[in-house]
Amino acid sequence: MAYNKSDLVSKIAQKSNLTKAQAEAAVNAFQDVFVEAMKSGEGLKLTGLFSAERVKRAARTGRNPRTGEQIDIPASYGVRISAGSLLKKAVTE
């Protein structure tokens, strides 16, 4: 089961001796910084945990699965997230 935001806030509050309000403020601040970094194209790296970068996806041709009609899919941006060494090690043990 994945943690949702309230689960994450509770865990951070427990582990760091913060109140839930303080932990929620920290999570919200991280979320804001993360989104700003992705929007600006700067990327974000937490050494050992993960790195994230904004990537451009090229325009391409696809097919409508219902009709089989060929459609043009415009270029867009996405996010590429790569696991860091600490995270990789933790999940393989």
From Swiss-Prot:
Highest rank taxon of the organism: Bacteria
InterPro entries, alphabetized: Hist_DNA-bd (IPR000119), IHF-like_DNA-bd_dom_sf (IPR010992)
Family matches, as SMART domains: BHL
Keywords, alphabetical: DNA condensation, DNA-binding
Pfam families, A to Z: Bac_DNA_binding
Gene Ontology molecular functions: DNA binding; structural constituent of chromatin
GO terms for biological process, alphabetical: chromosome condensation
Annotated Gene Ontology cellular component terms: cytosol
General function of this protein: Histone-like DNA-binding protein which is capable of wrapping DNA to stabilize it, and thus to prevent its denaturation under extreme environmental conditions.
Oligomer and partners: Homodimer.
Family as reported in the entry's similarity comment: Belongs to the bacterial histone-like protein family.
Protein name, entry field: DNA-binding protein HB1
Taxonomic source organism: Bifidobacterium longum (strain NCC 2705)
